[in-house]
Regions:
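Membrane-interface transmembrane helices that cradle and orient dolichyl/undecaprenyl
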Residues: 11, 130-136, 171-187, 197, ...
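Transmembrane-helix signature of polytopic, membrane-embedded enzymes
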Residues: 27, 108, 125-147, 166, ...
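Short helix- or helix-capping micro-motifs
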Residues: 31, 141-146, 194, 198, ...
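Transmembrane alpha-helical segments
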Residues: 32-37, 204, 348-353, 363-392, ...
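Transmembrane-lumen/periplasm boundary regions of multi-pass, lipid-linked membrane glycan transferases
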Residues: 53-65, 196, 205-306, 316-328, ...
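Transmembrane-helix motifs of polytopic, lipid-linked glycan transferases
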Residues: 109-132, 170-174
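Short acidic/glycine- and proline-prone juxtamembrane loop motifs at membrane-interface regions
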Residues: 153-164
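Short periplasmic/luminal acceptor-recognition loop of GT-C membrane glycosyltransferases, typified by
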Residues: 404-441, 466-476
Length: 513
């Protein structure tokens, strides 16, 4: 049975449509304003490895067109991009286009674009939740989506995840509109949005799958599988991804490495995995909101709506089990949980709103309640503002530029943060080799690979290098064999308070091979 478009219930914020729009616009402006604060800082505040990786790809594309740049610098930027392998070009191409429009590489510009995309997606989340519950339910959902501290920080990251999350929300909304109206217009919107989401980042297949599963279960298997429009949406979703995978696997032949060291089913029976998963949930949305969201699922009024929400959560769990290791170590793998929790909280918001309307508060009591909500929102935004303000990453530019000057023209093996991406992007140095962290070694051991012999590994990774750079002294302490070997075999070429450079061209007197 296809549901009719729902009639809207009254709102606690007033019967006037203009009052509801005003509340939404105030939230919209506040959501955008907090994300713009201190956005010109270096992208090291959130997942710097992933942000700098995207920045390297975008800079390489930009320098391919920047014929006015010095040839040496241009070759280096292009070389850094090519050596990083293949990734869907959607988001870094958007960044490159932005650089070309303004005529220079402005690192914070793609971060601003991510923030705008995330905030705009809140409009579709509101429309979806309003149709599922009410105006006030929609406001609760979008308030959580816009103002959850993790969501604020993650949504302005120079990485494709905010874009894929936004496209997933657009897909969910389009799917529900198709469920209500069943027209070819929504088939095209859903198919294109879902296809672009997965094409932008393959891991978006999970929230997209959740959206399709929800409609499948709400309508019924037989009705959906015999519906040509449902199949058309699936085909439109798959086409861009199949083209990209064909190119990656059979033309460029580098995509296979992106799926290596990903699947670890042995973690499913490890209690530590679930403890880490719980820790990630707490850091991303908070346990109180998590529990409230689970309760909220069952407050939806019809089983069809409950199936839609349950399907989003099923997709989240499948995602967790498929990429168990990264799910327990990388918080941005949980980013789609932010809108899912917002959707799940909506019935609770409507329940509270309904109770307040029944109390029929007078103007002053209504004013006090709204003032409390505003105070809570302002307090939350102030805390996020303080998080942005307390750390200034701009001085790191001079630090990495200095190291780049010292190492320029010399081949280097590096034990350094973010797989060398800070050194590459900020210092303009492409290391000859990257010395693995203890976490990298542990991951390979988890995959059943034997740990390498130290001397063999050292010779292999330094055979073309003149220097050995260490910028993470704590990690050096965590590898005592490496630390002892460097100290007893090679002189220090230069050192600072938080870096060491060993000269591999000269061995210390009495050093044994």
């Amino acid at each position: 049975m296809i549901e009719s478009v729902p009639q809207q219930r009254p709102s606690f914020f007033g019967a006037s449509r203009w009052a509801q729009v005003a509340v939404f616009l105030v939230m919209f402006v506040a959501a955008l304003a907090i994300r713009v604060y201190d956005i010109t800082d270096l992208p090291l505040d959130f997942q710097p490895t992933r942000q700098l990786y995207t920045a390297i790809l975008a800079r390489g594309r930009y320098y391919e067109q920047l014929t006015s740049a010095p040839q040496e610098q241009r070759d280096l930027a292009i070389g850094m991009r090519r050596i990083e392998g293949i990734e869907s070009p959607v988001f870094d191409s958007i960044a490159t286009f932005s650089y070309e429009v303004v005529g220079q590489e402005i690192l914070w510009l793609p971060r601003l674009e991510s923030a705008i995309i995330w905030v705009l997606a809140g409009i579709f989340l509101y429309l979806l939740t309003r149709d599922l519950t009410s105006v006030d339910g929609g406001l609760v959902a979008v308030a959580f989506y816009w103002f959850a501290p993790y969501g604020i920080i993650a949504s302005r990251a120079f990485m494709p995840d905010p874009l894929t999350t936004a496209l997933s929300i657009l897909t969910w909304w389009g799917l529900y509109r198709w469920y209500l109206k069943r027209s070819w217009k929504w088939v095209v919107i859903c198919g294109l949005a879902a296809g672009l989401a997965i094409f932008t980042k393959a891991l978006a297949v999970f929230p997209i799958f959740g959206g399709f599963l929800g409609i499948l279960l709400a309508r019924g298997l037989r009705k959906s599988f015999t519906d040509v429009q449902f199949w058309a949406m699936g085909i439109l979703t798959a086409i861009p991804t199949l083209i990209y995978m064909f190119y990656g696997f059979f033309v460029q032949k580098g995509l296979g490495s992106d799926f290596a060291l990903r699947f670890f089913p042995q973690l499913w029976i490890d209690p530590v995995f679930y403890l880490r998963w719980e820790g990630m949930i707490e850091s991303v949305i908070g346990l109180a909101f998590f529990v409230a969201a689970l309760v909220g699922i069952f407050l939806y009024e019809t089983k069809e709506k409950r199936w839609i929400l349950i399907s989003y959560w099923i997709a989240y769990v499948i995602f967790a089990l498929t990429f168990a290791y990264y799910f327990s170590t990388h918080d941005y793998y949980h980013i789609a949980l932010v809108p899912v929790v917002g959707l799940s909280l909506a019935p609770l918001g409507e329940l509270i709103s309904s109770r307040l309307r029944q109390l029929n508060p007078g103007k002053w009591l209504r004013f006090v309640i709204i003032a409390c909500l505003v105070f809570g929102l302002a307090f939350n935004l102030w805390n996020v503002r303080n998080t942005f303000h307390k750390t200034d990453y701009r001085p790191q530019l001079a630090y990495w530029q200095h190291i780049g000057v010292v190492l320029k023209g010399h081949s280097t093996t590096a034990l350094t943060q973010d797989y060398g991406y800070r050194l590459e992007y900020l210092g303009w140095i492409l290391p000859a080799a990257y010395w693995p962290y203890t976490g990298d070694t542990a991951l390979r051991e988890l995959a059943g690979m034997a740990p390498p012999d130290f001397l063999s590994q050292f010779k292999q990774l330094t055979k073309r290098s003149e220097f050995f750079l260490i910028t993470d002294l704590q990690e050096l302490d965590d590898q005592p064999q490496l630390k002892d070997y460097l100290q007893t075999h090679y002189p220090v070429y230069e050192q600072g308070t938080d870096y060491l450079i060993y000269d591999l061209r000269t061995t210390l007197p009495g050093a044994t091979p």
